[in-house]
Amino acid sequence: MIRKIKPQIRVIGFDDGTFSFKSKIKRDKTILVGVVMKGSQDVVGVVTRWIEVDGRDATEKMIEAIHNSRFKDLRIIMLKGITYAGFNVVDVEELSRETRMPVIIVIRKKPDLQAMEKALKKHFSDAEEKISLLHKAGKIKELIPGKLYYQAIGVSYDQAEEIIRLTQKSSLIPEPLRLAHMIASAVMSGESKKE
């Protein structure tokens, strides 16, 4: 739990790069980018790892990136959803426990969990494990009606909302996540994509 939220709170925001259908079949990798910021203003650094498309290593790679980084004053982990590189689902409870930090998941469109479960059951032998991780992420809360949703682990909903607002700059998406998305898509496709 965070006692006091400062405007310059140290946050790491993770997003993944683009990938093709062909890379899903071949089980290729895509880049995972973490952008470290002080609030919404100053970029402090960037960490990267490679994760398997539709794999099971996103959680491990995020933990590794945080533990092996020089950024020891991080206070919050932000995720742009919990599925990376297709259906490489993050175990947010493990991520929070192993890093000893709260996790805030920010989502632009409210996920259709039933459709996700159906797709997982149809295409993955480990579907039940992935579905379990989707449910472990907690209740989906609406911050801006129809436009922005979030989930929070290890931090109150009020604090999560305050942190989301503190880290927004020129978009509804918090700046660490917006920049992670731009960097990851530029690495994979040669040019940054719209958020």
Swiss-Prot record:
Domain of life: Archaea
InterPro entries in the cross-refs: Endo_dU
TM region positions: none
Xref: PANTHER family: UPF0215 PROTEIN MJ1150
Family: Belongs to the UPF0215 family.
Protein name: UPF0215 protein TSIB_1161
Biological source species: Thermococcus sibiricus (strain DSM 12597 / MM 739)
Taxonomic classification: Archaea, Methanobacteriati, Methanobacteriota, Thermococci, Thermococcales
